[in-house]
Amino acid sequence: GWDTPISTQLPEFKLRDYQGSQRVTVSDVLSHQVGLGKNTYDRDLESNIPYPLLAERLSNAPLACTPSECYGYQNIAFSLIGDIVFAVTGDFYSHQVETKIFSPLGMKGATFGRDALMANTNWARPHVYNGKQWVARTPNENYYHVPPAAGVNANIHDMALWLNAQLGHRQDVLSANL
């Protein structure tokens, strides 16, 4: 459930505060309330340091608060959800999402990975401001190494199907307690 401590599925998960590590729940991970500061280790991810090493390094990361007490957007910590999915199902996050969400909802354009994104001729590019204007950039491949945080691509039609399910209109896919 949402309130299950992730240490029950990932005993290797540690934060700098061991007791805090034992209290981090699935809900904390999904709501970016693990206790870490914003974007912990994103620069290392951008530098192509492998996700498993970054997840292990969370044990040394400074904490901004105790778990559940503050919000700090995460890519590395959020991606622990993929490890939890694998521990529970024995299957990869991307496959579980494809079979349990994309397919039943009819999200035919939804994909995982940068290659799938760039193979499509019609997609919104990320932009950065260079001090004078907004400039389009190519997505950083390294973020696609953490599919739970940054690996999904979806068009507006697929997003409408997803929103409809979140609003409770597809309880065959997303139950009411979600």
Language model: regions and residue ranges:
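Short, glycine/proline-biased beta-turn/loop segments that scaffold the active-site neighborhood
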Residues: W2-D17, L105
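Short, surface-exposed loop or secondary-structure junction motifs
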Residues: D17-L178
